[in-house]
Amino acid sequence: MSSTMEQYEQRTGGEFATAIDLAHLSRQTLGDRTLEREVLELFRRQARILLFRFEAVTCPSERAQIAHTLKGSARGVGAGRVAYAADELERAANAGEPTGKALAEVAEAVAEATSAIELRFGFDR
């Protein structure tokens, strides 16, 4: 392997490893790499859709449910930062508190995770 390729894999692998807990993902998929790819592609799509849905609704209970769904999805694939941020967003929505700051954190965490997934697997944005 060329040194350029090694550097690329180290850079993207490190970014992926911070966004997705690889050991957790492997346990969830029983080590099946094809299933890992499929699950991550579903998460990537769903996370973006849920962000748009959250912004589109105004009812606090609906917003909390959307955040809860994202939290569960993130936990399933090992996207810890997304799960933590979604938990904070769910809490704020349930409490009727402003959600702007929590939503910005979720959006940033989702962007980090989805970018890492796209880099690792070459998915189109």
Give the ranges of each region predicted by the language model:
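Two-component system phosphorelay core
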Residues: M1-R125
